[in-house]
């Protein structure tokens, strides 16, 4: 498999798509008016957001494939591999693209909080599907950025462009919250699977051999990206995925402590702790009592 093609700058994107560069660090493109692109895998040094206006080909993102549907928003952060199955074909995308270099937001409020927009780390099959009304809001944000790009660059340009990008991202947070709500029944099934996964893990020897399962491990077992999985669990339970796993471990630990034939050290090793003192400290942080104190209070 060939190495992915690197996209190094906004100017490169504009040149390859046959568009004029109005600002070296940011661009909004009408895909239907741009040159076709080669079907290949890409890795980008810039942030890329795509709004699709109609159904198009199958997109490959990481290890997964996704049938890119109409009214879909896809967010790609620098360093992520995306694209199509490799071929010599040229395709004509439709919809819109927003591209901005990290240097545009460096030192700004958005630059400091960009990592909080966790959907940049979602898998492509977890893309955002928007309604017609939401699409109009997205295009309004894009058009405000386009207006600033058409305006001669002055001391206000960067502030106004970045603030409109941030507003668009904040709207996207709202739209994702709506999508989480409308897919609640699907997410309940994920939580049921998560609970079953933890039960099986804790009942096996994995806990003693491998230690506590990580959020990434659980997400992979459920065919979700860690960020999407974490956001899903947080919205459905009010707890982070890590907190949920730890609470499950505490439940198992409490059951073990009830068995007075087992020492605290035995329980600690069985639960995957290398040192009993680490287990005692962890248990006390979570419960407010040491394992021995908890055992005495119940007996």
List PLM regions with ranges.
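Conserved metal-binding segment of the jelly-roll/cupin
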Residues: 68-82, 99-102
């Amino acid at each position: 498999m060939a190495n992915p093609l690197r996209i190094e700058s906004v100017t490169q994107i504009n040149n390859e798509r046959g568009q004029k560069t109005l600002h070296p660090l940011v661009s909004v493109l009408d895909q239907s008016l741009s040159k076709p692109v080669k079907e290949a895998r890409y890795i980008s040094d810039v942030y890329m957001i795509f709004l699709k206006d109609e159904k198009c080909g199958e997109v490959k993102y990481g290890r997964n494939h996704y049938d890119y549907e109409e009214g879909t928003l896809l967010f790609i952060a620098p360093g992520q591999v995306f694209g199509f199955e490799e071929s010599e074909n040229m395709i004509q995308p439709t919809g819109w693209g927003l591209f901005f270099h990290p240097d545009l937001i460096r030192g700004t409020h958005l630059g400091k909080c960009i990592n909080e927009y966790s959907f940049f780390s979602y898998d492509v099959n977890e893309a955002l599907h928007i309604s017609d009304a939401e699409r109009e809001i997205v295009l309004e944000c894009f058009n405000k950025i386009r207006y600033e790009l058409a305006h001669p660059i002055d001391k206000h340009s960067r502030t106004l462009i970045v603030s409109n990008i941030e507003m668009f991202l904040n709207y996207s947070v709202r739209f994702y919250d709506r999508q989480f709500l409308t897919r609640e029944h699907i997410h309940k099934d994920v939580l049921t699977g998560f609970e079953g996964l933890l039960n099986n893990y804790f009942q096996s020897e994995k806990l003693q051999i491998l230690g506590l399962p990580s959020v990434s491990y659980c997400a992979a077992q459920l065919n979700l990206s860690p960020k999407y999985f974490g956001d899903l669990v947080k919205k459905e339970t009010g707890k982070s995925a890590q907190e949920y796993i730890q609470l499950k471990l505490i439940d198992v630990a409490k059951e073990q402590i009830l068995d007075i034939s087992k020492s605290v050290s035995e329980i600690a090793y069985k639960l995957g702790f290398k040192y009993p003192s680490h287990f005692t400290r962890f248990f006390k942080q979570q419960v407010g009592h040491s394992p021995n104190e908890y055992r005495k209070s119940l007996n």
